[in-house]
């Protein structure tokens, strides 16, 4: 069974293509890394898959549901951590999670219980009563992940979850995500520029370039005998040569 399937998914902005004829196949239980250069169409794709942006053409099924027919049902069953963190700065971490759970229909006692468990799992229990505005960027990323998990989604969308956070925070988030997939708790669809981290996490990879899917499949098949970075560079055709000139850099005295 596929957690995500698209056929001919296309999005134009003012007549210009952002995503073209996308045919994604994300197996249930997979940790799927969706990669591409800046401006390749990753965020546009994620917005379409989460019901935040209507496609110009094509179809998408998420958890077996046709997005065009029942986007609200999909939104109830997925969790999303967007690139921009939309948190209430004047709430405490515990309040943020509890209220988020209640917005998904959880009773207050259950939302409170889940919030406490998530804070512990995310190593934020000691900061549960601090205002979100006093959290570091890495702590806010963890809290946003907790908000995406509190209602028990079957599919988790993560847009650049490791961007701008330190190695300790990355390690904690990575361990939690790996455990969720290993336990069969959910499917994860992730975009990231940090290929080294992605390579240690994902089971499947899709690479998008200039709005088109150029590579897709299990990680081992995509990277073949090389690294994911090497496969990525081959797929997007943007291997860089050493810059020419600049011989004046490093001179001790002006001439």
Which residues does each predicted region cover?
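Conserved catalytic motifs of ABC-family nucleotide-binding domains
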Residues: 152
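Conserved ABC ATPase "signature" region
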Residues: 98, 102, 109-127
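ABC ATPase "signature
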Residues: 216-217
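Catalytic Walker B motif of ABC-type/P-loop ATPase nucleotide-binding domains
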Residues: 156-160
């Amino acid at each position: 069974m596929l957690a995500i399937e698209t056929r001919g998914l296309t999005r134009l902005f003012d007549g210009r293509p952002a995503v073209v004829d996308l045919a994604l196949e994300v197996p249930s239980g997979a940790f799927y890394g969706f990669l591409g250069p800046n401006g390749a169409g990753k965020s546009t794709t994620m917005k379409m898959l989460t019901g935040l942006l209507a496609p110009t053409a094509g179809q998408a099924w998420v958890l077996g549901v046709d997005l065009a027919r029942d986007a609200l049902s999909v939104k109830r069953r997925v969790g999303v951590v967007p690139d921009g963190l939309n948190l209430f700065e004047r709430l405490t971490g515990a309040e943020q999670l509890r209220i988020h759970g209640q917005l998904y229909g959880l009773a207050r006692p259950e939302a409170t219980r889940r919030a406490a468990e998530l804070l512990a799992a995310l190593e934020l229990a000691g900061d549960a009563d601090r205002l979100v505005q006093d959290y570091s960027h890495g702590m806010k990323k963890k809290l946003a992940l907790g908000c995406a998990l509190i209602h028990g989604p079957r599919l988790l969308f993560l847009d650049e979850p490791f961007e701008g956070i330190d190695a300790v925070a990355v390690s904690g988030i990575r361990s939690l995500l790996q455990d969720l997939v290993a336990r069969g708790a959910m499917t994860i669809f992730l975009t990231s520029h940090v290929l080294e981290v992605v390579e240690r996490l994902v089971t499947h990879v899709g690479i998008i370039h200039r709005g088109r899917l150029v590579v897709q499949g299990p990680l081992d098949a995509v990277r073949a005998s090389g690294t994911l970075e090497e496969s990525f560079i081959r797929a997007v055709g943007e291997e860089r040569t050493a810059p020419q000139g600049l011989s004046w850099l490093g001179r001790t005295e002006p001439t």
